[in-house]
Amino acid sequence: MNDSTQAMIGWGDILTRKYAAKIATLVLAVWLHASNSMLTATTMPSAVNDIGGLNLLHWTFSIYLVGSIIAGASVGLLVVKSNIRTLMIRFALIYAFGCVVVALASNMPVVLGGRMLQGLGGGGLMGLVYIAQSRFFPSQFVPKIIACISVTWMIAAFCGPMVGGAFATWGIWRMAYWVFGVQALLLITAIHLLLPIEASNLSPKAERIPTVRLATLALAIVLMSLAGADYDRVMSPLLVFLGVMALALFVFQDRVALSSRILPKAVTNLNHPIGNGVLTIFLLCLCIMSFLIYGPTIMIKLHGVSPFTAGLVVMGETLAWSFSALIFSSTAENKEPMLIRVGSSLVVIGLIAMALTLSGRSLWMIVIATLIGSSGFGMMWGFIIKRIIINASSDEKARTSSLLPMALQLGFALGAAIAGIIANSLGLSETMNNDDIRHVAFWLFIGFVPLALLGNLFAWRFVRQDRLDSN
């Protein structure tokens, strides 16, 4: 496709009878996954008051992440055995069943079981959405579909806490999970009616799911989650190290496996665009967790803003990502490499700006700093995903597509653990004075700059290799 054709692709081309119903179905699947964490954050305190289990509260998030990543890692193999439509229905059923388990739970261990099922269902749906966008739509539509996904995450950031908070305020926190279970059933109906049955070469005798490798991956996530749960000067860094080693072992096991590979072959090849692209996503996502976790608390304590105002700043970051993705989604194809370079560079600049402004005295400068980094993400996001998938061979596209949300979530998990270690090792506490909080705020962001620069380097290498491979 030439550049002039790419430039002519607009929203009118994608929001047609042929594509709109498919997009709406995929967006509903993303909504169920994206809103889940926000919903849980506002309903679980009421659940603890009702059924106890405060000591297990942090696991309601971690266990969902474990299930989500495991399911996302598996879908690249599952689509060889079955079509996307059938698999999405199955994962939506798992998600719905998880909602029912949480809604009926009488104690926190049962809630955790339901959360694991929700994670498996949501992670599977998310992985299949990334595969579906490369199978159901022309490649030039991918940036716009990614923009739709970004907007869905934005809506989830707004609505998820409000929905969960409303049910919790009314004293019926369980009803929130019944409502999301019903939404999962609506998704099943939409999938059945609106998504096509693929005429592909399915293999009923395809390779089995590699349980040992998936167990190694699960161990890596659990170790990272433990590191961020309760800080210990010795154990927390050790757990992060062991988590990274377990992740590296998983990658090595998969690379030498004779069958049932989860990852594309090129993921460890730094001379291939897939390897550099995936590392870009992993590292840059890792680097944004400091603000999401500690930004509101620091703004409240250091700048005296209300929790509502701090929440608005965080929402502004989400808005900037989403609107940037929307605005740049119609960019001509020959401009995409530039946007990947500029966007990844803005993430680094935004991180440095956050280190300087969050520890400063101006709230508006903090807002500007958050907008810089998040706009950079939105600017590059759809294009790097599109080009990673394009650079995959035909038999690797499913593995590559399902790897992308997994890389994102692994980055979030490791970033959260590292941010917790930095904050707690510097003594962040309720009793700190403003000067000490400024010191912590500075290092919470500047400490991630080397990793962000490395991610930026991989982004530039990706563009250079992508251009060579495309010619």
Model-derived regions, located:
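Intrinsic disorder in cytosolic terminal tails and internal cytosolic loops
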Residues: 1-18, 460-471
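N-terminal membrane topogenic signal
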Residues: 13-22, 208-210
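Hydrophobic transmembrane-helix bundles of small-molecule transporters
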Residues: 169-279, 287
